[in-house]
Regions:
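Charged/polar positions within long, soluble alpha-helices
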Residues: 46-49, 53, 87, 91, ...
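Acidic/histidine-rich alpha-helical segments that form the ligand environment
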Residues: 40, 103-145, 159-167, 174
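Short, contiguous alpha-helical
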Residues: 57-101, 144-204
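Alpha-helical bundle segments that constitute or directly flank the non-heme di-iron/ferroxidase center
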Residues: 27-55, 77-88
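Cationic, low-complexity basic patches in intrinsically disordered or flexible, solvent-exposed regions
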Residues: 3, 7, 21
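Aromatic (phenylalanine/tyrosine) cluster motif
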Residues: 9-12
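Small-residue-biased structural context
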Residues: 30-37, 41-43, 47-49, 105-113, ...
Length: 204
């Protein structure tokens, strides 16, 4: 073995062992998206059902959501966003842009309904939507088809569906932030260690 070659071989072997232990992530699969989407209703139910209103009936200031608003927003998105836009991509491609999404469209959805009713409604509509999504039996070529978002321009169906899952996670984070704010004064100096009390990320 030439001088330096042994060291190079050891470096290559070390790199290969690291890659084997920490493989590069594979492309996000539709099955991964569905796996998360089908768990969100149960997660919300476990966290929120029968909690005292002191946790759920306040917001973060003018123009922001309560926990009840967030659940209503998720229901509204099931009806108006993900599958309607997926169908439009499959039927029209980029020739017919998506309808604009009303961030406050959930107000009517929530009217007169307690949080447990909204949790039940979200569980039901999510199950219906996932059944339809599975029934589409989407193929790789279909996932690469593009539609036109009113502000973002061309977006792929695969991107829309991955965003559906990330949107769930965004609002789970938002719910934790809204709820944690109720403890802001009570935690005293421990607030320095609590990232959730410092976050002001977008949640709508």
């Amino acid at each position: 073995m030439q001088p330096g070659a042994e060291q190079g071989f050891r470096s290559f072997s070390l790199h290969r062992s690291i890659v084997q232990r920490h493989p590069l992530p594979m492309a996000h699969q539709l099955s991964d998206t569905i796996a998360l989407l089908e768990r969100t209703p149960a997660g919300l139910n476990a966290l929120l059902r029968d909690l005292p209103a002191s946790w759920t009936d306040h917001n973060e200031g003018e123009g922001t959501f309560t926990v009840r608003d967030v659940v209503g927003h998720l229901i509204y998105a099931e009806n108006e966003d993900w599958l309607p836009r997926a169908r439009r991509i499959l039927e029209h491609g980029e020739s017919k842009p998506f309808d604009a999404f009303d961030r406050w469209g959930h107000v009517e959805t929530c009217r007169g309904k307690a949080l447990p009713q909204l949790l039940d409604e979200f569980t039901r509509i999510r199950a219906v939507c996932l059944q339809e999504l599975r029934s589409l039996k989407l193929q790789p070529a279909q996932l690469q088809r593009s539609g036109r978002h009113p502000s973002l321009g061309p977006v792929k169906l695969s991107e829309l569906l991955a965003t559906w899952a990330a949107h769930d996670l965004t609002h789970l984070h938002q719910i934790s932030r809204i709820m944690a704010a109720t403890c802001r004064d009570e935690v005293g100096p421990f607030a320095a260690f609590l990232g959730v009390l410092k976050c002001s990320g977008h949640g709508g």
